[in-house]
């Protein structure tokens, strides 16, 4: 499987963020997207996830499910955790599992297994409002496991994680790559896994 973008152009708020940008990632490989604030790291991920309109260039996924679009085969994990404070940890993950189609898929762990994998099984009954910043991040990461998708688009994925959390997430990413997955991550810090760097220039 190979994800590729050629000559990408992104415009936000009437301002050109970048143009002529090429990106590529293959099965089993990770790409660390680096660069100063405002360079377009998040914008690139959102283009690939189908959350921003592409103003120029082309994006494709070779070797994926031909009946699904790239956004339908990708997880986008933003720098903000999309959680409902009043719902329990388990309910939040179950919502996302159903919304993303995981409940109808045979592959991948169920919600309880995903929570155990990120060390949140003991707080599954608690409202998300009670979680620390690191725990909220781990709950968002559990979404990657609860619904199996080959492409992970991650925006500052290790933010709020302590050293143990970063190590655990590195193991999760390693497992995803070992299964033939693809990871593109915008980051200011090392991911803890082998990754090719794609640096985007720009101003802060």
From Swiss-Prot:
Top EC class for this record: translocase
Primary location: membrane
Molecular function in Gene Ontology: ABC-type heme transporter activity; ATP binding; ATP hydrolysis activity
InterPro entries membership: AAA+_ATPase, ABC_transporter-like_ATP-bd, ABC_transporter-like_CS, ABC_transptr_haem_export_CcmA, P-loop_NTPase
Keywords, alphabetical: ATP-binding, Cell inner membrane, Cell membrane, Cytochrome c-type biogenesis, Membrane, Nucleotide-binding, Translocase, Transport
Pfam families listed in its UniProt record: ABC_tran
Reaction catalyzed: heme b(in) + ATP + H2O = heme b(out) + ADP + phosphate + H(+)
Every ABC transporter domain range: 3-204
Superkingdom classification of source: Bacteria
TM regions (residue ranges): none
PROSITE patterns: ABC_TRANSPORTER_1, ABC_TRANSPORTER_2, CCMA
Compartments it resides in: Cell inner membrane
Family: Belongs to the ABC transporter superfamily. CcmA exporter (TC 3.A.1.107) family.
PANTHER family: ABC TRANSPORTER I FAMILY MEMBER 1
Subunit structure: The complex is composed of two ATP-binding proteins (CcmA) and two transmembrane proteins (CcmB).
Protein name: Cytochrome c biogenesis ATP-binding export protein CcmA
Taxonomy of the source species: Bacteria, Pseudomonadati, Pseudomonadota, Alphaproteobacteria, Hyphomicrobiales
Name of the gene encoding the protein in the UniProt record: ccmA
């Amino acid at each position: 499987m190979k994800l590729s973008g050629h000559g990408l152009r992104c415009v936000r708020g009437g301002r050109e963020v970048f143009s002529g940008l090429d990106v590529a990632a293959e099965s089993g490989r990770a790409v660390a997207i680096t660069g100063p604030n405002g360079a377009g790291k998040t914008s690139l991920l959102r283009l690939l996830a189908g959350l921003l309109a592409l103003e120029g260039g082309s994006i494709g996924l070779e070797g994926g499910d031909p009946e699904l679009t790239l956004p339908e085969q990708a997880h986008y994990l933003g720098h903000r955790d999309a959680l409902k404070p009043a719902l329990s940890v388990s309910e939040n993950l179950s919502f996302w599992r159903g919304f993303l189609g995981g409940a109808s898929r045979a592959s991948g762990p169920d919600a309880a297994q995903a929570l155990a994998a990120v060390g949140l099984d003991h707080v599954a009954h608690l409202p998300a409002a009670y979680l620390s910043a690191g725990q909220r991040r781990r709950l968002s990461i559990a979404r990657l496991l609860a619904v199996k998708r080959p492409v992970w688009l991650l925006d500052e994925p290790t933010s709020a994680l302590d050293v143990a959390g970063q190590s655990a997430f590195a193991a999760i990413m390693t497992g995803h790559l070992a299964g033939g997955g693809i990871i593109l991550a915008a980051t200011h810090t090392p991911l803890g896994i082998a990754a090719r760097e794609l640096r985007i220039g720009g101003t802060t």
